[in-house]
């Protein structure tokens, strides 16, 4: 019978060249670079809440790290190390092989080393639980934060919105389904936004709700033009609005930047070959006004909240 430590050695023990000590001891030892601050974020994925039972293991390995990388992107931090904790209903080696393949393929792309974690057998028939903590570095006082937006700043968003939520609602759209299961973290964008953006956040719970976090922390409001939002193509207009504004799981970046920085942002878009769209502006009135093509205010649904009913 395979043991917990056999599983760790076989599927998750990799050389950690940028850590003093990695997997295999009671704790990892890390050495941040001189003049750097540590950015730390944790995300938990729960079966039947964040992914369906039977989800492809390789894609799940990718997504479990990608959502954490997206937090690093939103902070303008360079990802460095991660820990992984799993609560497994059973020791399924085929599943573990696929999961670790997806996890480490993405980790290699972004230079992330797995330096620790834990595995536990959960209740028989119970849900699979995946918890990743990621650590990154950012130069002192250079991190992108949620509390820096100022009146007259422009509001920008990367990529397109709504694909992941549409992929969950309609399984026949393969492109949308891929966006749901294998999101692309905007790490390069986050790093390049240092010195340009005044505030940033990733779109995990829905555009409206996540922009709302910036507004709340910054003590400001916003006017957003719905028709300017970059959207995944969805024929049903009602479903489109729900997916775009409150669907979540897009893992694009919303950021604010001074009104005069448009040329720099557009140059950055060209350099990264990434769509960056100006969608509104920050104001002093502390609310979010979403306007339709005729300038009428739209009702905006809240995004995802684990404890709302």
Residue ranges of each PLM-predicted region?
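Helix-biased detector of long, well-ordered alpha-helical tracts
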Residues: 1-309
């Amino acid at each position: 019978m395979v043991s917990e430590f056999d599983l760790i050695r076989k599927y998750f023990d990799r050389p950690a060249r940028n850590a003093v000590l990695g997997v295999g001891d009671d704790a990892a030892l890390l050495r941040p670079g001189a003049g750097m601050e540590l950015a730390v974020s944790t995300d938990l994925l729960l079966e039947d809440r964040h992914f369906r039972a039977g989800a492809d293991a390789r894609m799940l390995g990718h997504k479990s790290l990608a959502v954490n990388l997206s937090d690093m992107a939103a902070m303008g931090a360079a990802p460095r190390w991660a820990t992984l904790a799993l609560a497994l209903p059973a020791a399924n080696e085929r599943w573990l092989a696929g999961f670790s393949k997806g996890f480490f393929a993405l980790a290699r792309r972004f230079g992330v080393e797995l330096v620790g974690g834990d595995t536990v057998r959960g209740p028989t028939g119970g849900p699979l639980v995946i918890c990743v903590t990621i650590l990154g570095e950012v130069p002192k006082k250079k991190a992108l934060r949620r509390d820096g937006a100022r009146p007259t700043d422009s509001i920008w968003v990367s990529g397109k919105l709504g694909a992941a939520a549409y992929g969950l609602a309609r399984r026949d759209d393969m492109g949308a389904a891929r966006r749901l299961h294998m999101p692309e973290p905007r790490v390069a964008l986050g790093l390049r936004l240092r010195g340009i953006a005044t505030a940033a956040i990733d779109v995990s719970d829905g555009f409206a709700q996540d922009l709302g976090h910036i507004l709340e922390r910054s003590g400001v409001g916003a006017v957003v033009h719905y028709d300017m939002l970059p959207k995944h193509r969805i024929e049903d207009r009602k479903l489109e609005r729900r997916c775009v504004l409150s669907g979540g799981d897009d893992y694009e970046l919303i950021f604010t930047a001074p009104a005069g920085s448009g040329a720099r942002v557009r140059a950055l878009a060209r350099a990264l070959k990434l769509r960056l769209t100006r969608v509104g502006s920050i104001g002093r009135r502390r609310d979010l006004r979403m306007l339709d093509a005729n300038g009428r205010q739209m009702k905006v649904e809240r995004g995802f909240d684990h404890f709302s009913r």
